[in-house]
């Protein structure tokens, strides 16, 4: 398919009036499995390897004692919402986004735990799945299950921001993430800032670990220009999307579907994409999650899953009592693989941003920007599906589809996050892909 077949000119954005962003800090009880007290003596480096890097933790303690004692624990929950989205952040558990939902259809576009059930996965041991985990300067970073600093800010444009951050004690890097919700927009924005205040060059890694609910009808959507996927360290490559879901089986499956990973857990990184989005879609719920960021700064696109197998069921029980399977749609800054560290110079400041938003009703995603997600795909016969889900109100927007030099669809529509566009268009001769 080439640029001769164009769809979608969304024009004339019209802001809604009188819509506010709400921000508050509240105390909420969440069922929590307690962890035991850490080792009181310092633990120095013993040659341990963690996530492909040196696994030293000093001066942090090791939280490796789990218990089966569950209590109703009070948490400080930081909440942001507007008419479209509602999110919750837990500064006492690493500043992660704990929950996010689309208010127009109640779809949780991040995996939302109904409780806190840690497992021994993090750098310091205890670790929580779900939501969005900020991994700086290492994967499943040291303070992922620890309290970190936070503050709230109201901005002149009407948006509101919850900032979380810390000075990391091993590298002495300072980092902060500002999570914002805007009036009249369905996106959640994260602004990331990493500073090296030390006189020495330091290594750093950034990956946002985004979890989503998944099932037999869930599909990972890499950009359509992706033809290859890589495993960790880039030591193994696979064709995309058709390849061995279960390594060593000798059988090819569609790697984009969670249901096909019946053998074991798996990570696959998108290789060589020139596009700036990543998505996932639940066809049973006809809804999904989209991420957009500058691909030159945030090139990493990856998914991880425990799998549709006994191993996956085991990890479900380890990490959650009631919330089911999840899949991680990770995105990496300054990195397209793990572990893939970059160097940050003395005094260097790195800043970038990324957004996520829910989509619905369009049966998949073929491209996405900050303004909208589009689906354009063949259905039956000569028909193509044309779908748009916008992140704000567009009045009298124009949808245009061209076949060669001829317009075959020209529509004026009103569209917003609560009102998607989905129609069929007939293409005169779809048999030759070079004409599309």
Enumerate the language-model features and the residues they cover.
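Surface beta-strand/loop "capping" patches
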Residues: 361-394
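A contiguous, surface-exposed recognition patch within enzymatic or periplasmic domains that forms
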Residues: 26-38, 42-43, 78-80, 85-99, ...
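Aromatic sugar-binding surface patches on proteins
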Residues: 415-430
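Asparagine-centered strand-capping/turn motif at beta-strand->loop junctions
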Residues: 193-200, 388-390
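Beta-strand-rich binding/interaction modules
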Residues: 383-412
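Mature N-terminal, pre-catalytic/accessory segment of carbohydrate-active enzymes
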Residues: 19-67, 71-81, 85, 93-95, ...
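Extended, loop-rich substrate-binding clefts of extracytoplasmic carbohydrate-active enzymes
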Residues: 44-72, 77-81, 128-186, 216, ...
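Short, aromatic- and glycine-rich surface loops/edge beta-strands on solvent-exposed regions
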Residues: 399-400, 431-436
């Amino acid at each position: 398919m080439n640029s001769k077949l164009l769809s979608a000119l969304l024009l004339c954005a019209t802001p809604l009036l009188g819509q506010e962003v709400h921000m508050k800090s509240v105390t909420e009880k969440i069922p929590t499995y307690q962890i035991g007290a850490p080792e009181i003596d310092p633990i120095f480096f013993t040659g341990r390897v963690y996530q492909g890097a040196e696994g030293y933790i000093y001066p942090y303690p090791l939280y490796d004692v789990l218990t089966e004692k569950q209590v109703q624990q009070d948490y400080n929950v930081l909440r942001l919402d507007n008419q479209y989205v509602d999110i919750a952040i837990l500064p006492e558990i690493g500043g992660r986004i704990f929950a996010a939902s689309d208010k127009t259809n109640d779809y949780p576009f991040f995996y939302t735990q109904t409780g806190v059930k840690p497992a021994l996965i993090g750098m310091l041991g205890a670790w929580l799945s779900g939501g969005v985990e900020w991994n700086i300067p290492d994967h499943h970073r040291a303070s992922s299950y620890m309290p970190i600093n936070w503050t709230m800010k109201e901005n002149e444009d009407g948006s509101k921001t919850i900032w979380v951050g810390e000075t990391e004690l091993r590298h002495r890097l300072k980092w902060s993430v500002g999570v914002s919700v805007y009036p009249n927009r369905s996106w959640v924005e994260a602004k990331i800032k990493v500073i090296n205040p030390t006189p020495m060059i330091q290594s750093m890694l950034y990956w946002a670990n985004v979890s989503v609910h998944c099932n037999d009808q869930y599909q990972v959507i890499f950009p359509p220009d992706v033809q290859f996927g890589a495993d960790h360290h880039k030591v193994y490559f696979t064709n995309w999307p058709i390849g061995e879901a279960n390594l060593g089986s000798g059988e090819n499956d569609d790697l984009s579907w969670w249901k096909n990973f019946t053998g074991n857990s798996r990570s696959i990184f998108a290789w060589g994409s020139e596009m700036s989005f990543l998505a996932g879609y639940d066809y049973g719920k006809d809804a999904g999650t989209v991420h957009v960021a500058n691909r030159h700064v945030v090139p990493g696109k990856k998914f991880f899953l425990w799998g549709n197998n006994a191993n996956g069921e085991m990890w479900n029980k380890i990490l959650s009592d009631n919330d089911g399977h999840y899949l991680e749609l990770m995105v990496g800054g300054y990195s397209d693989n793990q572990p893939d560290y970059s160097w940050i110079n003395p005094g260097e400041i790195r800043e970038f941003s990324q957004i996520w938003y829910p989509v619905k009703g369009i049966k998949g995603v073929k491209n996405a920007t900050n303004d909208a997600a589009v689906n354009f795909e063949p259905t039956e016969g000569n028909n193509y599906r044309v779908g748009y889900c916008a992140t704000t109100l567009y009045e009298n927007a124009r949808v245009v589809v061209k076949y060669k030099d001829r317009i075959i669809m020209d529509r004026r529509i009103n569209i917003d996050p609560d009102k998607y566009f989905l129609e069929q268009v007939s293409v005169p001769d779809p048999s030759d892909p070079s004409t599309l």
